Amino acid sequence: MNFTSTIGLEVHFELKTKSKIFSPSPVTYGAKPNTETNVIDWGYPGTLPMVNKEVYRLGLMVALATHSHVNPVTHFDRKNYFYPDNPKAYQITQFFKPLAENGYVEVEVHGKKKKIHIHEMHIEEDAGKNTHGTNGFSYVDYNRQGVPLLEVVSEPEMTDPDEAVAYLEKLREIVQFTGASDVKMEEGSMRIDTNISIRPAGQKELGTKVEMKNLNSFEHVRMSLAYEQKRQQEILLSGGRVRLSTRRFDTNTGKTVLERVKEGDADYRYFPEPDLPPYHIKQEWVDEIAANLPKTADERRKIYVDEYGLKPYDANVLLQNKESSDFFDATVAAGADPQQAANWMNTQVNGYLNEKHAELKDIALTPENLAAMIKLISDGTISSKIAKKVFAETVANGTDPKKYVEENGMAQLSDESVLAPMVKEVVDANPQSVEDYKNGKDRAIGFLVGQIMKQTRGKANPKVINKLLLADLASR
């Protein structure tokens, strides 16, 4: 018997604001527990929330980038539930009138393009974080309480794990390149909930839905959905029934584990947030945001390949994150050859970042200095070998490449009037090499080049030496 899978995804993005959604508390990842929170986050009596306008601006950028319809009037609602990491016993979210609806993301899977539609996206506040100690105690950190989130809810249109992952990869790329979120899954800036049901092929009625919460990698999404497909098929083939439930993915076994069985959808008793008025979004503001949207990854990819002549692979490496792409763009804008800039970014720069477990913003290298160093190579001032020494200094200390080369006498000797007598002297002193060259032994050239490099302590420009050598040998 054949089965059809129906998959839906809910993705939470932590929006990149300096302060929280309803309070002035700062947002800093990794801060000491309970140092970035206040009475508004806790919902103390007499406190009132105030909406951070930047949250709406970032949310609108994502809405526009995903072709979503922006609702001109939105409002917040209370989602009522009790849990230790939720000190107010309710969450402020958007249930009845979300930020935007009816968008889509276009993906390509197995060589076929498909539009996966977005049901809606809404703004809400995050909860705190529970940590369960080995001493029998549980601890709550409220630093995350009130951090702004954008939840993007897909239509249940995906039919296999590959489609789900393709959608997530594309959505992550879109959100990252708007600048709305840093989408760092390891820091909780992007969190994924999935739901999947299966039914016999041809049956219109959907099967019973199983949810999986807080999956923290695309590979875990793929593995958990594939496992659920198989598990649910085996249940139906054996005459059983799939139960409405929430499960978690066990990374050690590669299986999903039951967390709780549900008798129906939870009743959170939503009602309009009484402390916040409706939020009106003016079309002029939407138009202004649309006009200033950053280039998407697809737009940048087209420029890199079609205009700069980069190979698609090199372009995709640069586009793995917005920070890298922005740095590359700035390097080219500073005058660097695009291909050389891509080569250095994808090899030496990325190698240094991996070695130091750092990001571009953490190191001393600037696009201007990288461009200056590339120009020193292009104009023959330094060799590729010397460039690596210059790069090591520049990336570590932010030293100006040109100044460093001048102060340390690292410039190549390219003056033909200076090198020509040296070439003649070396050729005159090595008649056997001349004879070998004339007899077709090209390795003789390498020996002669080596002798000249020895005389100049490695500073002679190899291209100029080769040119002069060939001219001298041809005249004999």
From Swiss-Prot:
Among Gene3D superfamilies, the record links this protein to:
1.10.10.410, GatB domain, N-terminal subdomain
Note the coiled coil stretches, chain numbering.
none
Q: List GO BP terms, alphabetically.
A: glutaminyl-tRNAGln biosynthesis via transamidation; translation
Q: Which keywords does the record carry? A: ATP-binding, Ligase, Nucleotide-binding, Protein biosynthesis
**Record-linked SUPFAM superfamilies:** GatB/YqeY motif, Glutamine synthetase/guanido kinase
Cited SMART domains: GatB_Yqey
What is the catalytic activity of this protein? L-glutamyl-tRNA(Gln) + L-glutamine + ATP + H2O = L-glutaminyl-tRNA(Gln) + L-glutamate + ADP + phosphate + H(+); L-aspartyl-tRNA(Asn) + L-glutamine + ATP + H2O = L-asparaginyl-tRNA(Asn) + L-glutamate + ADP + phosphate + 2 H(+)
Q: Which molecular function GO terms apply here?
A: asparaginyl-tRNA synthase (glutamine-hydrolyzing) activity; ATP binding; glutaminyl-tRNA synthase (glutamine-hydrolyzing) activity
Top-level taxon of origin: Bacteria
Q: What is its EC number?
A: 6.3.5.-
Query: Has UniProt tagged this entry with the keyword Isomerase?
Result: no
* Family label: Belongs to the GatB/GatE family. GatB subfamily.
The UniProt subunit note reads as follows:
Heterotrimer of A, B and C subunits.
Q: Which NCBIfam families match?
A: gatB, PRK05477.1-1, PRK05477.1-2, PRK05477.1-4
Question: What role is this protein assigned?
Answer: Allows the formation of correctly charged Asn-tRNA(Asn) or Gln-tRNA(Gln) through the transamidation of misacylated Asp-tRNA(Asn) or Glu-tRNA(Gln) in organisms which lack either or both of asparaginyl-tRNA or glutaminyl-tRNA synthetases. The reaction takes place in the presence of glutamine and ATP through an activated phospho-Asp-tRNA(Asn) or phospho-Glu-tRNA(Gln).
What is the recorded name of this protein? Aspartyl/glutamyl-tRNA(Asn/Gln) amidotransferase subunit B
Higher taxonomy = Bacteria, Bacillati, Bacillota, Bacilli, Lactobacillales
